[in-house]
Amino acid sequence: LRDHQILDVKGDWHDKRPGLRPGAWAFQYRNEHYPDTDDSSVVAMALDRADSDENRESVDRGVEWIIGMQCRDGGWGSFDADNTHYYLNHIPFADHGALLDPPTEDVSARCISLLAQRGYKTDHPAVAKGVAYLKRTQMADGSWYGRWGTNYIYGTWSVLCALNAIGEDPQAPYIQRAVA
């Protein structure tokens, strides 16, 4: 997996994050211009668990990229940062509504899970902003949406796992609302 880490190609994400070094993984082969935060978080977690000493440099670089890709609202999009120009979904050829890459709860949960595994706590700014984002985006019924798993069960379990990993109180009212 280390051999597939993108360390020298600055993709479209670099437009919004020009000072950020590459350090991510793509969903598919030969797609160096479009790495994503979701798969990068999972790969970094796997490398960290496999042999944290041998993989430390690679994982650290991945974590740096993940933190750098956090959106202003505290969440994470998949391929880009702050790509939330919703008006674009209303132009005639945007009938599939996928011209954007807004932050989503499931992807944000994966990024927070990586940070938790690496020892980050809720007092770290990226984690604090991420948890605040998840609290704001919780649905009235207690669930969270999962864009990439495309349902509320997927989104909710993803978020609950991340909140557990980061040490949120399972008795907190918002967590209890999710499991009720």
Residue ranges: model-predicted function:
Residues 1-180:
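Preference for long, amphipathic alpha-helical scaffolds in soluble/luminal domains
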